[in-house]
C-alpha cells in the first residue's frame, strides 16, 4: 500500500516541479531549452507581421470600379465600360471574362490610366458571359467589381434588326423626299398666284388711268358732231 501511495505521489511532485519551473524566470547564463511557457517561435511572429502588412496593403489598395456596363453588343464582340472614384490613383485595369457555368477564364490587362472601356472579342453568339473589372495601383489590385451578366445575340437576329433599320432609313428618306416635293409644289403655286395678282393689279391701274382720256375724247367728238357754225360766225337758218 505504501508503495502504491508512493508511486501515486511521484507524478504529483513532478507536476508541481514543472509548475515551479514555469513560474521561475530563466537565469542569465542558463542554457536550458525553452520550457512549456517560453516565448512564441519566430514563425508565429513572422505570420503575425505578414497579416499586419497584408491588412495595411489592403487598406491602401484602390476601390473596385463602379458603373460597369456592357454596350455595343454584337454576336461576336462587345465593349465593357466602367468608372472609378475621383480620389483613386490607378495605373491600369484588369478585366476578367468567362462563360456562365464554365470555369474557363480570359484575363485582359489594360495598362492605361485614362481608359474607361475595353473591347471583348472572339465571343460566341447566343452565349451568356460574366465580366469583372479590377483597378490596379502601386499598392496592388482592388477587389473585383460587381459581376455583369450579358448574352450575345444570334447573327440572324442581328441581321434582321439591321435590315429593319435599313428599311426604316429608306422609308424615312422617301418620306423626306415626298415632303420636299410637296413643299416645292406649294411654293411654285404661291409664286404663280402672286404673279397673276400682280399682273391683274397692273392691268387695272392701266385701265383706270386711260378712263379720263377716253371721256375727254368722247366729249370732244360729241361737240364736233353737233350743229355746224356759219362761216361768218352766225348760225345757218333753214329756208322755209
From Swiss-Prot:
What are its GO cellular component terms? endoplasmic reticulum; extracellular region; peroxisomal membrane; plasma membrane
Q: Where is this motif: Microbody targeting signal?
A: 238-240
Secreted as a keyword of this entry, yes or no, is yes
- Record CDD domains: FN3 (cd00063)
What GO molecular function annotation could you give as one example from this UniProt entry?
hormone activity
Comp. bias intervals (Basic and acidic residues): 11-24, 210-221
Q: Which UniProt keywords apply?
A: Cell membrane, Glycoprotein, Hormone, Membrane, Peroxisome, Secreted, Transmembrane, Transmembrane helix
Q: Which InterPro entries match?
A: FN3_dom, FN3_sf, FNDC_type_III_4/5, Ig-like_fold
Q: Which residues are glycosylated?
A: 67, 112
How is this protein named in the record?
Fibronectin type III domain-containing protein 5
Q: Which organism is it from?
A: Rattus norvegicus (Rat)
**Gene, per the UniProt record:** Fndc5
